[in-house]
């Protein structure tokens, strides 16, 4: 859980060497720098953000739903631009924050639109996947490197 991870870091839990969390919980770590170091955010690596994925079976059986899911994400980004106050209220409610508090948290996010997603999957994704696969193989998490070109179906972000 991202909130629990942040809380453990700022509490100084000796059993925690590293944790993955996100805004608004990352803000708690940012506010207490002696508790931990933030290594990377979407400001450093724009595509490190929430992701969604579907199984190949789902994509094959439900291409319209998959396209609608991607288009819905991009519509949400349009709403953030067009009506940020309302957008921050909605998103803040999901993480138990006021709209004003969420607005401050989201200042540390870089929202990736359709064009940025297309750019990422046109090159950066392949490089990242190769580096990740090499590392996972080296440390024994995977036994062989999968077909990296089959990891993402980008037709839904076109």
PLM region descriptions:
Residues 23-25, 44, 57:
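Solvent-exposed coil/turn segments that connect beta secondary-structure elements
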Residues 61-141:
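Secondary-structure end/capping motifs
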Residues 11-21, 33-36:
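Alpha-to-beta junction loops
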Residues 132-158:
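C-terminal solvent-exposed extensions
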Residues 28-42, 102:
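Ligand-binding "clamshell"
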Residues 1-11, 24:
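Short helix-initiation/N-cap motifs at beta->coil->alpha
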Residues 49-64:
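A bilobed periplasmic-binding-protein/Venus flytrap-type ligand-binding module shared by bacterial periplasmic
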């Amino acid at each position: 859980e991202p909130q629990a991870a942040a809380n453990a870091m700022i509490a100084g839990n000796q059993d925690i060497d590293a944790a993955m969390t996100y805004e608004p919980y990352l803000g708690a770590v940012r506010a207490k720098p002696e508790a931990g170091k933030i290594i990377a955010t979407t400001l450093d690596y724009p595509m490190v953000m929430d992701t969604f994925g579907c199984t190949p079976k789902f994509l094959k059986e439900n291409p319209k739903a998959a396209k609608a899911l991607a288009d819905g994400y991009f519509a949400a980004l349009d709403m953030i631009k067009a009506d940020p106050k309302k957008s921050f209220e909605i998103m803040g409610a999901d993480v138990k924050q006021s709209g004003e508090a969420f607005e401050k948290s989201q200042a540390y996010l870089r929202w990736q639109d359709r064009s940025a997603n297309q750019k990422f999957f046109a090159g950066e994704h392949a490089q990242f996947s190769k580096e990740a696969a090499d590392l996972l193989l080296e440390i024994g998490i995977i036994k062989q490197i999968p077909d990296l070109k089959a990891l993402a179906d980008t037709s839904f972000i076109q």
